[in-house]
Amino acid sequence: MLFRSKDAPALQAWYKRHLGIDVQAWGGAAFEWSDAEGKPIAGTTAWLINPAESKQFDPSKASFMVNYRVEDLHALVKALKEEGCDVLDKIDESEYGKFGWVIDPEGNKVELWQPPAGQ
């Protein structure tokens, strides 16, 4: 989950103080997954607060962006395009995985993330 904030450092501090979220220098936190018994399993949920002027949310004007973990980004992007969805042409690939984006019918930018193998 990604948020856009008018005062990112202050909002990050609020979440850290009141909800105990361990906000890192990059502006967010990563929550490791576990099963119902508390045993670690592969996966993380990213949580991030960005400054209001961040271009990461463009072309959406929303103050948030949801990130969905996907199994095969290239196949999903292809299917979404075939279904007539507004898919951004850019796909980013890095050590953090593959990232793509689609705009939902209300204009919200949705991030699609395929993690690296083994995560």
Could you describe each region identified by the protein language model?
Residues M1-K6, D22-W26, S34, A52-Q119, ...:
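Vicinal oxygen chelate
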Residues L2-A46, E82:
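Core segments of cupin and vicinal oxygen chelate
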Residues W26, A42, P59-S63, E95:
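Short, solvent-exposed coil/turn segments
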Residues A30, A46-L48, M65, E111:
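Generic structural signal for residues positioned in beta-strands
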Residues W33-D35, P51, E93, Q114-P115:
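Active-site donor-binding loop signature of nucleotide-sugar glycosyltransferases
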Residues E37-P40, K55-D58, I91:
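Short secondary-structure boundary/capping segments
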Residues W47-A52, C85:
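Short amphipathic beta-strand starts and helix->beta connectors
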